[in-house]
Amino acid sequence: TLFNIKNIVIQTVPVALGALGVIFVVSIGSTDISVGANAALSATIAALISQSTSEFLMIPLTLVISTLIGAFLGWIITKFKTDSFMTTLASLIGLRGLMNFILSLKTVTAPRYLLTISSFKVSLIILVIFVVIVFFVFEKTKFGYYCKSMGENERTVKAIGINTNKIRFICFCISGFMAGVFGFILLGKVSGASSTLCNMMEMKIQMAIFLGGILVTGGFSSKLFKAIIGSFTIVIIENGLVSCGVATSPSE
């Protein structure tokens, strides 16, 4: 029905937005499983600060905080040559713990205007805008080409004089930024922060990317349309399980 289609699109928007950022990280052969925790913590801190200042600072603050978290992870991985999976896994646990600590001290509510932004029409417009931007950057620029080339053979890319550390750092910054985008949208949907905000989003995003046909090693298998198709696929599967009477916990 039309209602079901609309519901699927609404649920797909945050997954697809997250995938638009994570695809950069995956294309270079790395991974970022901290985006859900990053989104939740960034939106929570930004909403908390905006409660005592201006509610219109909430969105810019969310994007700044989430990008800084992504930049910090990118710096650790490039500086200390740590494994991206283990680094982002540790940050996932740490960020969730910090968020739970904040929520134990304060009640965090979302600004009212976020209800409008998280609505069907506005959130879909936001997705379309970012799809166009990311398509251009990822598919039509040298930066996107270098990202995919790193996934194929990083040594070769480094040998021709490309700063692979800089590219990796920027990819994690982009992933962090996009985490902030779907973070404030999901916060607006539930009207306030809770310990379950953006729960399992990192897994949904990873599954969306790989279900779409992008290889774990990244490279030139990384295509934007695959991430979008994968995002719809994972949401349709989840809704299908619920429609079949499967409880929420097993379906997740």
Annotate each predicted stretch with a short phrase.
Residues 80-141, 170, 189-195, 250:
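Transmembrane helix-bundle core of multi-pass membrane transporters
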Residues 1-52, 77, 81, 209-221, ...:
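Single transmembrane alpha-helix segments in multi-pass membrane proteins
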Residues 1-7, 109, 138-139, 172, ...:
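Inter-helical junctions in multi-pass inner-membrane proteins, predominant
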Residues 52-56, 60, 69-73, 119-194:
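Helix-loop-helix "hairpin" substructures at the membrane interface of multi-pass membrane proteins
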Residues 194-252:
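Transmembrane alpha-helical segments in multi-pass inner-membrane proteins
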Residues 21-23, 96-97, 126-137, 175-182, ...:
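Hydrophobic core segments of alpha-helical transmembrane domains in multi-pass membrane transport
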Residues 2-10, 53-60, 113-124, 193-200, ...:
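Interfacial loop-to-helix junctions that mark the boundaries of transmembrane helices
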Residues 53-92, 230:
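Alpha-helical transmembrane segments within multi-pass membrane transporters and channels
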